[in-house]
Amino acid sequence: IKYFPIITKKYLQQNLDEFIVKNIDKKKLIHRTTGGSTASPLTVWSDIDFQIKDKANTIHYMENLKMNVFKDRSIRLYGDKIPKNLINKNIFWVKRKNKVIMSSFHINKKTLYFYLKKIQEFKPRYIHTRPSAIYPLAKLLNEGEIKLNLNLNFIIVDGEYLTKGQRNLIEKSFSTRVINIYGHTEGALVGHGCLDSNHLHIMPQNGIIELLDENNRALKKKKLKGQIIATGFNNYIFPLIRYRTGDVGVKSNIKCKCGRNYNLLKEVEGRIQDYVIDKESNKVPIAPAIFNYNDINWKGVEEFKIQQKKKGKITVYLNLEEELNKKKNYILFYFK
């Protein structure tokens, strides 16, 4: 595999259509978008087959944690939108079968009680969330007099870089263990903690991981930290071979007690999550606030930047390719 060239995000953006297979109708495909507060967004294409395999990955690592995604009661805490008529009643969630889907947008000192009351009432076996979504709740819980009486197996976090400070506070506040999941929108790698270790187990059925130095060479024996290069197995529609993820991984030399012969990462170093301030002066994680908009086709958006000078209002700067300038109202529609 070392004879293949390394693919960068910029190269993908400039040659996007060349990476999509030609023998399928593009209208039948699904697309998702990568990015951050200052970044060049990338549209990643896939089909239903990849989506099924992606779901199977979740089922697999949850089974490794002795959890059943179909039967176990759980809470999802992300940037989901909740109907206004519910918000007006201090209900910031919807219930679907054995799952409560909560919105992280409304967590503050005034609403904390309602979130905690619902969590206590529902008694989930696990909570699935982003670090930046659960952290404000953990912080408020840690500072207050309200205590939860739960029997949580885990809090499972993904989608962002998890700091040691976040892990420690979340575990302390909820009296349970945090399981970190590593993945990315491009879908070439999935890694997870296990019952015996917080080290990330890179699932071999999903793709190949390489850790390379600044000269794109394999790490020397004594060096543990390198850029993560991913080769995915499951996305026939949009194959990625030796893709530079932009993440930095720290190699682990231990053999995990779980017995799985996976490549292990001690940790992944990434960008600490950014926040914006809403009208009520609450900190809102910027990733779910912006990147719920996967309906947008970001092709033609070379770069974007998010700036906030006034609470409750953000300015999005778009650097568009010349052809897309004619269609800029299409993009602006989604940000109103």
Language-model region placement:
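Nucleotide 5′-phosphate-binding alpha/beta core
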Residues: 1-33, 39-72, 121-128, 148-150, ...
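Gly/Ser/Thr-rich beta-alpha loop segments that engage phosphate groups in nucleotides
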Residues: 38-41, 81, 161, 185
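Conserved AMP-binding loop of ANL adenylate-forming enzymes
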Residues: 59, 63-94, 102-105, 159
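Glycine-rich, histidine-containing beta strand-loop boundary motifs that form or position
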Residues: 45-47, 78, 130-131, 182
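Active-site glycine/GP-rich loop and adjacent strand/helix microenvironment
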Residues: 94-336
